[in-house]
């Protein structure tokens, strides 16, 4: 009997160049580089928490690709990577920048991932021992091949009774020349959805109906989260859980909380705040990883939410794209 124990993530592996915002890296001739990519960040966290993880991606057929593959395997991640001539995708973001605004500069076209046809592995190879598939909406934005592969493997996952999660990760720069509403084509295969009320509006055309004042304590945020979740459930009844994260920044200060719609009720996490954070990248991915981890373990819904929110908030104080050993989900 097949041991369905692995979590499969499908997405592009990236190098994140992180120059300081003052430009001192030019004189010091020193530039911080992190390995990143939304699905990789999720995979790395899940592996650190002792889940069995596979990453379906593409790597260049050179020493950089070999070193990256070795790094992933060292982290306990099984790698399914079609290797071709080309280069790894990159992005530039200063250490105090935010992935959601114009301070990020992508250099991922062309890359081995955006040029791949993803035909290196059969469905049986991809889904061997897999019980969960995770994708973010970054991946289908990268190429028509990537979009069609997302549709195919999500459909195949459901045919194999594999749970599917989707992170509605909206990056405006990636959707400039295409309609984000095409993500609706993926929704019939999704069981667990993460995002926020604004990304749901962008991707699924479910409008924000309440007047929001941008205040962290605005009760209309919860009303809208509940209303949005009900509309998602109405349109896509296969979606069993809907998570929203709310992060508000004012200068260096941050306020944070999250919600989870499950069993037809809206759960709300503890609220967090800090006067200063260290890192804006990867918090949402760590939330997603914790959400998957909690569901796989069979934890109560409120604990799943609280753990995910706490992990995501803690990630704001960890440099780099992924969590480190300081964030142990079993000892929060």
Regions found by a protein language model. Name each.
Residues 157-163, 236-240:
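A short helix->loop->beta-strand "cap" motif at the edges of active sites that frequently abuts
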Residues 8-23, 254-270:
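Acidic-glycine-rich active-site phosphate/pyrophosphate-binding loop
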Residues 109, 138, 169-173, 198, ...:
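Active-site beta-loop-alpha junctions enriched in small/polar residues
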Residues 174-263:
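Conserved phosphate/ATP/ADP-binding segment of small-molecule kinases
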């Amino acid at each position: 009997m097949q041991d369905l124990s692995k979590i499969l993530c499908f997405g592009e592996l990236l190098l994140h160049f992180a120059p300081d915002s003052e430009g001192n890296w030019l004189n010091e001739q020193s530039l911080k580089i992190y390995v990143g990519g939304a699905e990789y960040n999720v995979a790395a966290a899940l592996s650190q928490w002792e889940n069995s993880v596979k990453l379906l991606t593409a790597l260049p057929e050179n020493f950089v690709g070999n070193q990256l593959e070795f790094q992933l395997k060292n982290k306990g991640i099984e790698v399914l990577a079609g290797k071709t001539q080309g280069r790894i995708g990159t992005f530039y973001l200063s250490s105090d920048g935010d992935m959601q605004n114009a301070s990020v500069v992508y250099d991922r076209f062309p890359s081995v991932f955006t040029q791949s046809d993803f035909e290196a592995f059969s469905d049986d190879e991809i889904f061997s021992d897999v019980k969960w598939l995770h994708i973010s909406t970054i991946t289908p934005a990268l190429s028509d091949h990537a979009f069609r592969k997302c549709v195919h493997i999500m459909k195949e996952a459901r045919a194999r009774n594999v749970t599917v999660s989707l992170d509605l990760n909206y990056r405006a720069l990636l959707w400039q020349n295409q309609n984000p509403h095409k993500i609706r084509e993926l929704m019939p295969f999704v069981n667990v959805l993460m995002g926020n009320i604004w990304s749901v509006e962008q991707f699924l055309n479910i409008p924000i109906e309440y007047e929001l004042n941008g205040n962290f304590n605005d009760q209309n945020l919860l009303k809208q989260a509940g209303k949005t979740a009900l509309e998602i459930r109405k349109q896509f009844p296969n979606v069993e859980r809907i998570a929203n994260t709310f992060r508000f920044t004012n200068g260096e200060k941050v306020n944070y909380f999250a919600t989870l719609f499950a069993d037809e009720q809206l759960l709300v996490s503890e609220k967090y705040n800090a006067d200063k954070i260290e890192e804006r990248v990867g918090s949402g991915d760590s939330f997603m990883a914790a959400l998957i981890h909690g569901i796989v373990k069979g934890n109560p819904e409120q604990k799943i939410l609280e753990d995910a929110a706490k992990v995501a908030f803690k990630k704001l104080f960890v440099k780099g794209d992924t969590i480190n050993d300081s964030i142990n989900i079993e000892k929060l």
